[in-house]
Amino acid sequence: MSDLSAHTPMMQQYWKLKNQHPDQLMFYRMGDFYEIFYEDAKKAAKLLDITLTARGQSAGQSIPMCGIPFHSLEGYLAKLVKLGESVVICEQIGDPATSKGPVERQVVRIITPGTVSDEALLDERRDNLIAALLGDERLFGLAVLDITSGNFSVQEIKGWENLLAELERLNPVELLIPDDWPRDLPAEKRPGARRRAPWDFDRDSARKALCQQFATKDLKGFGCDKLTLAIGAAGCLLTYAKETQRTALPHLRSLRHERLDDTVILDGASRRNLELDINLAGGRDNTLQSVIDRCQTAMASRLLSRWLNRPLRDLKVLQARQDSIRCLLDSYRFEKLQPQLKEIGDIERILARIGLRNARPRDLARLRDALGALPELQNAMTELEAPHLARLAAITGTYPELASLLERAIIDNPPAVIRDGGVLKAGYDNELDELLAISENAGQFLIDLEAREKARTGLANLKVGYNRVHGYFIELPTKQAEQAPGDYIRRQTLKGAERFITPELKAFEDKALSAKSRALAREKMLYDALLETLISHLAPLQDSAAALAELDVLSNLAERALNLDLNCPRFVDEPCLRIEQGRHPVVEQVLTTPFVANDLGLDNSTRMLIITGPNMGGKSTYMRQTALIVLLAHIGSFVPAASCELSLVDRIFTRIGSSDDLAGGRSTFMVEMSETANILHNATDRSLVLMDEVGRGTSTFDGLSLAWAAAERLAQLRAYTLFATHYFELTVLPESEPLVANVHLNATEHNERIVFLHHVLPGPASQSYGLAVAQLAGVPTAVIQRAREHLGRLETTSLPHEQPAAHKAKDAPQVPHQSDLFASLPHPAIEKLGKLQLDDMTPRQAIEMLYQLKNLL
């Protein structure tokens, strides 16, 4: 709103502030409430389910309004942040008692989904990331910031495909893009995408701002000096963070250069299908992390999630982690460390809040307890001889001076906020103790003073009192007023009484009337000074937090290795993937019966397995467990297998299951083909590829042709491939492609019911058991019976598919029979004969039916 002259002074002040933040909800402090006006009020009332009302008039119109009590702010903020909204907090900074006109107000905080730091607004086991993006169709600079930990990274990525896969991995809650980019770009479709002015991405300004933030002359030390696009994106992020926090950011100390080549790349479909930390329903149950995460601290859980979503190809790092896990397993050393690690808590985020100067008293109490636990933990770590663990121990250190300071300063169980005081211990500051004593002991002082004055003057009717208008006084009956001592100064005359004050009482009054407010101000000043002291030690404290989080993850992986029967994989130079008695780590935990372990062997002689077998026979489980074993190996973990030998892989692809993409206007088959195309374009001879039921979303012959061609292409690429299919024609591929082999999941039928044995055996399956699975699923008996009739008719009249000429050799494998859906219909007599229920017929009925059948011939 530009013309403010018609508004009241209060609303003029409001609009001057609101015009600076047009796209964010403004919470405007008025006394004990945050008021919300105009369109913000209508939106907030709906989102928060609070009453919308009106507040008088301004500019001739009533003002839509809603409000919340100031002490309930955090709960409402949490709800709005979860809904993706941003909120501007506008506080009163002037004194209402001395202000002429509206009390002075200013914006003190801007809360956005990506820049929140309050514990109540965060998921403790998930990173809360904000990203910025700059580039063109060919090359992109991506910067990512977690303001709750100080982790700040940059990278440059080629092409939309790789960029979208990386955004899927990071899942930032906010994504900043230049306002001059074309509309409807793929990145803008992500939730939380926000446009920023192009000058926020200026590369020269960004470089200067980053060097100033890190107190360096250039960015060469971070290995990203030449990443101009990423630097522009990082500069935008830094500006945005400072704009929202309204304070310096001392906990942002460095910039990490990430490279896709250092990682095993998983696209979005693969992450979803493997259910690493989010299941297909969007929850966390029955995910890989739910099984392998028994970390003692939330910061370690977040680190483990980062490892799972960013497996490494750096053999030195992986072997260092393996050695650390072995060391922690030796003599069950992890059991001694884990209870001590639990005492550390989430100091990573506590330190970030200290850096942002919004740490709460309970944050400092938790930091005090963590620092107090470090010496005992440090002693336990001296026994760990693994080189990587020794480095972590050296980084961790101890902080006796800070621990002592916090022990002297913070009471055992402090209140949630500093606002009302009661945080600092007695004895920490003499002036504060005196002010608190005056405030808390005023009543006793007056009682003692009255007793002393009665004794001094001999006036038994003397009283000491207080009222808000005249303050403290000594009261005497009018008849005794003339006997008042010389140091009594007349203050007030009443009917029948005179009130006096003495120099001693006046001095006490001056202290007492302001003692409480002065005590609160003094305590806040001391608390802020305490934060500044901690900020001066922030760098080593953050390094210690990172080391402790990694120690926690490694201890957790050792505990999981012991209790889940995991074994150390061995990386080799020879291209291979050999697994003995491999298991699915998640399925194994939910089964009530023993899990059937299986072997897998892929090397230079066999690069692809064609997997056949019945639905529910275990094909998808076998494929997924292979991918999870490979992924766990690439985070340095032990794996669910008796043994595992593998070479480093560059990518893991999964095309398992599909659903349509209604929002994107794509059918199930289109989604399936898009995922297949991505695999065929990007897979290499170092990639692991899982393909399940390719081609099932279209007609039989189209689907078979596509599946066949895709399998041939993957065989030619020499990718490590598990190709599950119900197209039995594909089982002849080994005859034309020497790197392909057949395996199947076995099953048997007993009393017309299927029994899944889940063993992976060489060769193709003999049949698909489709009707048996349908019966197991509860399809009505009549429908199953009718299906058997149709199946019998089709198998009786169909012609076998002719094999390609290349596969007609006499030693070609026997392909299980597939029905020809286009064969001629059976003779009516045969069809009627197939429907007969012979066990229900009498001899006479059987003879009559025989004559009827003869007449049909």
UniProtKB/Swiss-Prot annotation:
Record has Metal-binding as a keyword: no
Residue positions binding ATP: G613, P614, N615, M616, G617, G618, K619, S620
One annotated GO molecular function: ATP binding
Region Disordered: start-end pairs: 797-820
Gene3D superfamilies referenced in this protein's UniProt entry, alphabetically: 1.10.1420.10, 6.10.140.430, DNA repair protein MutS, domain I, MutS, connector domain, P-loop containing nucleotide triphosphate hydrolases
Record's keyword terms, sorted: ATP-binding, DNA damage, DNA repair, DNA-binding, Nucleotide-binding
Superkingdom field: Bacteria
One Pfam match: MutS_II
GO biological process: mismatch repair
Task of the protein: This protein is involved in the repair of mismatches in DNA. It is possible that it carries out the mismatch recognition step. This protein has a weak ATPase activity.
Family per similarity comment: Belongs to the DNA mismatch repair MutS family.
Protein name as it appears in the record: DNA mismatch repair protein MutS
Organism of origin: Pseudomonas putida (strain ATCC 47054 / DSM 6125 / CFBP 8728 / NCIMB 11950 / KT2440)
